[in-house]
Amino acid sequence: MVVLDSVSTLRESIQKWRKAGLTIGFVPTMGNLHAGHLSLVKQARQKSDKVIVSIFVNPLQFGPDEDYDRYPRTFEADKALLQQHNADAVFCPSVDEMYPNGQAQTRVIAPEKMTSILEGAKRPGHFDGVTTVVAKLFNMVQPDIAILGQKDFQQFAVLQQMVEDLALSVELIRAPIVRDETGLALSSRNQYLTEIQRSVAPKLFVALQSIEMAIRSGNKNYSSLCQIATQQVLSDGFDAVDYIQVLNASSLEEPQQGDQALVIVAAAKLGQTRLLDNVLVSL
């Protein structure tokens, strides 16, 4: 596995692989890798000849009061895991390498109808930071496929829209959420949880499953289902619920009669830690 920290060395490797007619799979991450990330690497390995993983904690997607400075950076451990999982290259640029013009650089602005809701409502500017860095990474890596996790559901939908709108020649693949034995969705931020909070955390998924079962039983009063689930999560010990909603899985809009693919999305806080989760429902 090669470690690349500049755009020029990245492009040299890619050029060699392209000349040999090899396909490239790409997994963009912010590091602090866990089994969820590694499942993406495994899928990329199965679907492509060469696998590149990027590790870059992107300052553009963090707000002023968010956890950019304390976001876990575990590069040596990450590198060892990627080697074990047969990645071919890890791209780990500095902030200056990614953004030589600093804050003055060109931005990619995501569609407001998809970014003014859910995470976007809580984190203004977050998705413009995501689309900017991912568009730039796609341009640098030029992958055939990119594997992204389902846990950040809104992010996947926004990036899929970006790929379509900008006619980028990459296929996005959404990989299922990886959960621990309690049902908690794996996340780099789970390590912030205390032992007591960790025992409460899986109850968010339980609440989403109860909505799913009700929908499958024919209940279409989504607003009422989400209100009941919100009260349940709060009584289970969560400190706040930012949202629990049922949406069209493609457009992220309110479900319409006849929609076949729905997603139940949620964000809730335990102490200072925000947990995201979602459940897909195919009707």
UniProtKB/Swiss-Prot annotation:
One of its GO terms (biological process) is pantothenate biosynthetic process. GO terms for molecular function: ATP binding; pantoate-beta-alanine ligase activity. Keywords: ATP-binding, Cytoplasm, Ligase, Nucleotide-binding, Pantothenate biosynthesis. The reaction proceeds by a bi uni uni bi ping pong mechanism. Belongs to the pantothenate synthetase family. The gene is panC. ATP binds at residues 30-37, 149-152, 178, 186-189. PANTHER family: CYTIDYLATE KINASE/PANTOATE-BETA-ALANINE LIGASE, PANTOATE--BETA-ALANINE LIGASE. Its main location: cytoplasm. Its EC number is 6.3.2.1. InterPro entries: Cyt_trans-like, Pantoate_ligase, Pantoate_ligase_C, Rossmann-like_a/b/a_fold. Beta-alanine binds at residue 61. Gene3D superfamilies: HUPs, Pantoate-beta-alanine ligase, C-terminal domain. GO terms for cellular component: cytosol. Catalyzes the condensation of pantoate with beta-alanine in an ATP-dependent reaction via a pantoyl-adenylate intermediate. This is Pantothenate synthetase. It comes from Hydrogenovibrio crunogenus (strain DSM 25203 / XCL-2).
